């Protein structure tokens, strides 16, 4: 089963989520604040982090920012759960790379479970990772068979010579 790190400072709410997710069979770790969350994320390497936004010490937004810039855990899936329902807060989470942003007052416990399953079933984006296995030419070098579209000094696009001399 997937490993889930549950980060929630409200103990009673954390206990409710923990019990429900445990019933689903997830391998759970918990943290009560942002500092604990970061330490646990690096140690446990969860498949998913459920992250409260408003926490003591480090906010969920700051935790997410640190996660996305820490190579060992940068591609970990993250669901943010918060009482903050403003569009600006949701946009902030999305800009930081959250996989799903849920407003606690707008979802049931079962909605949370459904969203966890959806996020875990979504392939991790690798758009920012380099393509391995294909050597890339140095800047300004035109590979054999390609057309040079770099502008010449006069602004016209370059073209390969008709009869190249070697």
Task: State the predicted function of each range.
Residues 8:
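Conserved acidic carboxylate
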Residues 11-29:
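Two-component/phosphorelay signaling modules centered on CheY-like receiver
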Residues 30-39, 60:
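Helix N-cap/capping motif at the beta->alpha junctions
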Residues 39, 61-74:
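Short amphipathic alpha-helix used as the core "switch/output" element in two-component signaling
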Residues 44-50:
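Active-site beta3 strand of CheY-like receiver
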Residues 52, 82:
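Active-site residues of response regulator receiver
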Residues 55:
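Receiver (REC) domain active-site loop signature in two-component systems and cognate sites
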Residues 62, 85-102, 106-114, 118:
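Alpha4 helix (beta4-alpha4-beta5 surface) of REC/receiver domains from two-component response regulators
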């Amino acid at each position: 089963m997937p490993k889930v790190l549950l980060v929630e400072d409200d103990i009673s709410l954390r206990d409710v989520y923990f019990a429900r997710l445990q019933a689903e069979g997830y391998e759970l770790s918990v943290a009560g604040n942002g500092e604990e969350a970061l330490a646990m994320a690096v140690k446990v390497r969860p498949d998913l982090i459920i992250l409260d936004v408003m926490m003591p010490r480090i906010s969920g937004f700051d935790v997410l920012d640190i996660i996305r810039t820490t190579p060992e855990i940068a591609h970990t899936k993250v669901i943010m759960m918060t009482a903050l329902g403003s569009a600006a807060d949701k946009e902030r989470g999305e800009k930081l790379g959250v996989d799903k942003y849920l407003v606690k007052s707008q979802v049931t416990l079962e909605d949370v479970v459904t969203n966890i399953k959806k996020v875990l079933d979504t392939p991790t984006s690798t758009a920012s990772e380099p393509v391995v296995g294909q050597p890339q030419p140095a800047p300004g070098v035109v590979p054999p068979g390609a057309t040079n579209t770099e502008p010449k000094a006069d602004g016209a696009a370059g073209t390969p010579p008709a009869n190249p001399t070697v």
